[in-house]
Amino acid sequence: MANNQASLLLQKQLKDLCKKPVDGFSAGLVDEKNVFQWSVSIMGPPDTLYEGGFFNAIMSFPENYPVSPPTVTFTSEMWHPNVYSDGKVCISILHPPGDDPHGYELASERWTPVHTVESIVLSIISMLSGPNDESPANVEAAKEWRDNRAEFRKKVSRCVRRSQEML
């Protein structure tokens, strides 16, 4: 039953995004037969180091969505403090509901069933605009962000260039 409700909700969210696209990203299904796997393209936000980039990601939804959050994994190269080396995005709203066992996040910052694909992607765009280096997924990127901005910029520029070459 939950699987069917999740499927219907995801179909509705995809339909809504197609009817009313949001600036900065596009979304579609990886496979027309599987509404639980989405392909997402995010444009690097203006006036950021990621500007001009076209970054692809896979959004994977659990069968109990929206009770539990999806995972988002960049398939494009990404150098960012809040993205693991395997491309998995680490932001508060993608963390399971409840208290943070590490004490970094308030429960109110974590996943709630009111979030949508749109709110998730807007949070990722915001993450690209301003990294959180307090609890990084990529410690090396966070260290560069804090201590060696020129090297950080160089690596991000390479990611942007490579994303453009993939078009």
Swiss-Prot record:
The active site is at C90. Signal peptide: none annotated. Transmembrane segments: none annotated. GO terms for molecular function: ATP binding; ubiquitin conjugating enzyme activity. Pathway: Protein modification; protein ubiquitination. Residues 5-165 form the UBC core domain. It catalyses: S-ubiquitinyl-[E1 ubiquitin-activating enzyme]-L-cysteine + [E2 ubiquitin-conjugating enzyme]-L-cysteine = [E1 ubiquitin-activating enzyme]-L-cysteine + S-ubiquitinyl-[E2 ubiquitin-conjugating enzyme]-L-cysteine. Keywords: Acetylation, ATP-binding, Nucleotide-binding, Transferase, Ubl conjugation pathway. Disulfide bonds: none annotated. InterPro entries: Ub_conjugating_enzyme, UBQ-conjugat_E2_core, UBQ-conjugating_AS, UBQ-conjugating_enzyme/RWD. GO terms for biological process: protein ubiquitination. Its EC number is 2.3.2.23. It comes from the Eukaryota. The modification N-acetylalanine is found at A2. Belongs to the ubiquitin-conjugating enzyme family. Accepts the ubiquitin from the E1 complex and catalyzes its covalent attachment to other proteins. Involved in the formation of multiubiquitin chains. Signal the protein for selective degradation. This is Ubiquitin-conjugating enzyme E2 14. The lineage of its organism: Eukaryota, Viridiplantae, Streptophyta, Embryophyta, Tracheophyta. The gene is UBC14.
